[in-house]
Every structure is written in structure tokens, then in C-alpha cells.
């Protein structure tokens, strides 16, 4: 089963928080976007 995308905080309190979210999102799309053979 595919996990849900990371939850987006309503407000990013720091640059690190934003970067972590973007990194998790990229990881999520890398997993989800992988072709199924």
C-alpha cells in the first residue's frame, strides 16, 4: 500500500521546517511515481 503524502503544516515556522517538508514530499513522489512492473 502507498502511504499518504506528508501532512502540510498550515504555517511553516522556520526554514528548516519548510525544507524538511519539501524533502519528504520529494521522497513521497519518488516512491509513488515509480513505474509498476
From Swiss-Prot:
Q: Which UniProt keywords apply?
A: Amidation, Neurotoxin, Secreted, Toxin
Could you tell me in which tissues this protein is expressed? Expressed by the venom duct.
* One GO CC term, this protein: extracellular region
The Tyrosine amide modification is found at 37
Q: Any transmembrane segments, and where?
A: none
Q: Which PROSITE patterns match?
A: PANCREATIC_HORMONE_1, PANCREATIC_HORMONE_2
Q: Which domain of life does the UniProt lineage start with?
A: Eukaryota
Q: Where in the cell is it found?
A: Secreted
Coiled-coil portions: none
**Xref: SMART domains:** PAH
Q: Please name the Pfam families in this protein's record.
A: Hormone_3
Query: Could you give a GO molecular-function term held by this entry?
Result: hormone activity
By its UniProt entry, which InterPro entries does this protein fall under? Pancreatic_hormone-like (IPR001955), Pancreatic_hormone-like_CS (IPR020392)
- Its function? Causes hyperactivity such as jumping, rapid circling and tail flicking, after intraventicular injection into mouse brain.
The miscellaneous comment for this protein is: The mature peptide does not contain cysteine residue.
The family note in this entry says: Belongs to the NPY family.
Q: What is this protein called?
A: Neuropeptide Y2-like conopeptide
- Organism, by scientific name, is Conus betulinus
Amino acid at each position: 500500500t502507498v502511504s499518504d503524502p506528508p501532512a502540510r503544516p498550515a504555517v511553516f515556522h522556520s526554514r528548516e521546517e519548510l525544507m524538511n517538508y519539501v524533502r519528504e514530499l520529494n521522497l513521497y513522489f519518488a516512491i509513488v511515481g515509480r513505474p509498476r512492473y
